[in-house]
Amino acid sequence: MEAVRGPIRAVGRVALAAMFISGGADALLEPGPRTAKAEELGVPLDPELAVQANGAAMLVAGAALALGIRPRLAAAVLAGSLVPTTLAGHPYWQVEDPAARRQQRIHFFKNVGLFGGALLVLSERPRARRRRPPRRRTASG
């Protein structure tokens, strides 16, 4: 089982990162729809800049997670970005229309699942760095 654990983790990280990469790129390149929500919440920065900064963080951390570059740090950034995004972006309990409320609830709990996935990555033990064997010196070198 140990031989399969590495590839399973790698595939899992890529699958988890996909939503962050996609959503982050979308927020970075087309912040418009999210900007109004940021304005409503009274974000202290320029709302468009705040949305784009959050999108950039999700994109970069998602890519790092997918590539296995500092996955625990990437997961921490992603988990941290999910809390305000989820609470601000999907407050289903405030929506009157039943169909819209159902959609917002789905997105809210999808984000809760992504948060859980990020916590699982955070809970992994750090990989042991492989040490290269010492180089042998030859008489000529």
Regions picked out by a protein language model, each given a short descriptive name:
Residues M1-G141:
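Short amphipathic, positively biased membrane-proximal segments
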